[in-house]
Amino acid sequence: MSYYDTIFSDHIDKIKSEGRYREFKALKRQADNFPFAMCDDKQIVMWCINDYLGMSKHPKVVQASIDAVLKYGVGSGGTRNIGGNNVAILELEQELASLHNKEASLVFTSGFVANDTTLATLAKIMPNIVFFSDELNHASIIAGITGSKAEKHIYRHLDVKHLEELLQSVDINRPKIIVFESAYSMDGFFSPVKDIINLAKKYNALTFIDEVHTVGLYGKTGAGIAELLDCSDEIDIIQGTLAKAYGTIGGYITANHSLIDAIRLSASGFIFTTSLPPVISTAATHSIRHLKESNQERKTHQQVVSKLKSSFDRFNIPYLKNESHIVPIIIGDPIKASKASNMLLNEYSIYVQHINFPTVPRGTERLRIIPTPAHTDEMINDLSIALVQIFAALNIELSSTKELNDEIYLNLIA
């Protein structure tokens, strides 16, 4: 083994010893039988998929994709500046701006890139900028802020009092931006959006909200928590994804014309990469349009979420209680979390990927359950029974959600 191979092997061995080694499952999703998939020639029920509403297989979206690929081909052919600025992506950007009631939008190849490159570029455009970021913001937000090398202040999770203290420490005339998520993907808690908006106004700051886990799911037309709270007009930059509730791929930001144009002209992560293919842009546009008009998917989704949480309450399964659709089951041990995930798959044909550090803090390792409108009462009952039996086999204690919430909160702020 070479010197360099030894370095890589030692790194992998360390991760394995901590129970954090990740193995990817070879899945074959069944578009005509959602949320089922095939894994090792066995049919399984998927409980951890981010295709929240099953829009990836919706007839309107699928047909639009077929029509687009026959008309435009598979790829986009280049960057937005050189050959890749197709009509389909322009139509998608118009649809996104309309969805969020903003003047303009800009589409990126992923939600990660949208956050990373936008935040870094804002710092390039405003060299004296100060970032204020929630301590549990997504890795893409952290990457953008850290990579910008701008001054940053990290406020305690969802703590607007601490945020205000930090804002007070910076000259009110200095450019600043508060960056936060509407819903946090690992615990499902909502941000105090209106309180943050009020602080931004008071201290002359821009607001940047990540609506990745809420667009399509909340609000009258699916525009997210800002729409639900009727405050979209008070937020400067809304970021979202096309890869979750809308069932496709890509990320975006929406804002006023001047901000979007400045990012378009300056963001390396936008300029120097091939654009989304027309087939994807077309599919996303049709998915957005459908969910703007139809509330049935959102209504059914919320009903399934409520049924799942009620079932977990009956079985005393220790999930982290929140008001969102994200249902984290806290295990608190990386080895047991991995074993629980494998037992669900191998013994019960249920797929729930375990989540360990560094995605979540040590001691809060978990199974994150993602309900969809397609999950049935029988599936909910099967999952609940399987979890109780696995908890018993692994000697994982059942506890009330109140006790769990208190315990996790202490871990998060430690």
Swiss-Prot record:
Binding site for pyridoxal 5'-phosphate: S185, H213, T241, T273, T274
EC number, UniProt record: 2.3.1.37
Gene Ontology terms: biological process: protoporphyrinogen IX biosynthetic process
Binding residues annotated for substrate, in chain numbering: R22, S133, K152, T359
InterPro entries registered for this protein in UniProt: 4pyrrol_synth_NH2levulA_synth (IPR010961), Aminotrans_II_pyridoxalP_BS (IPR001917), Aminotransferase_I/II_large (IPR004839), AON_synthase_class-II (IPR050087), PyrdxlP-dep_Trfase (IPR015424), PyrdxlP-dep_Trfase_major (IPR015421), PyrdxlP-dep_Trfase_small (IPR015422)
Family of this protein: Belongs to the class-II pyridoxal-phosphate-dependent aminotransferase family.
Assembly and interaction partners: Homodimer.
This protein's name: 5-aminolevulinate synthase
Organism: Rickettsia bellii (strain RML369-C)
Classification of source organism: Bacteria, Pseudomonadati, Pseudomonadota, Alphaproteobacteria, Rickettsiales
Gene that this polypeptide is encoded by: hemA
